[in-house]
Amino acid sequence: MTGGIHIEGLTKRYGEGDTAVDALKGVDMKVAPGEVVGLIGPSGSGKSTLLKCLGAVIEPTSGRMTLGDQVIYDNGWKIRDLRELRRDRIGFVFQAPYLIPFLDVTDNVALLPMLAGVPNAEARKRALDLLTALDVHHRAKAMPSQLSGGEQQRVAIARGLVNRPPVILADEPTAPLDSERALAVIRILNDMARQFETAIIVVTHDEKIIPTFKRIYHIRDGVTHEEAGDGRGFE
């Protein structure tokens, strides 16, 4: 598999000896460039642990991870600068928005590409284009404290997409949104995946969007199983 996300035999153990807990037990997973895949499972099944490993937030115990064309982990980290990886190669969309309180909406979204060296005008254009697509452009100059929960989430989604990273990890991105806006977010993710050859994993419990995925991974007790989805939202 060239590009995308490729996970082989990934494990994560917390603790030692009799008190050790195996959160991931040999996870295998593939997401092709240009593909959006759903990841579902009950609370405590290992979803968040898997995303944290993929996002280089925590270190796995063993296994192999490839993001894009780069092996980032093979029974140990294979890259030196994990902060640069998280900034430039991976887009994160969290259930809690975590917007910077002293920056307005546009600056919250434009900050990451500016830090990556994108000229200010281009970074702001990218930000406004995404804010428009997510129907929150009318709040471009508002401060985070002035936004509703749903508006904050849409701004956070724009921020996760603005750098056009090869990999996007989205954790419950549509939880606070109504059906129309939730499906709009999935359409935007799919459009971005196709346009920029982005590999996207969406962790969700949201029954509104589960039927949109063409492929779904179920995770339970740290083990993943793949199945075909309906894919209706991608037509």
State what each model feature region is.
Residues 4-5, 10-219:
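ABC family nucleotide-binding domain
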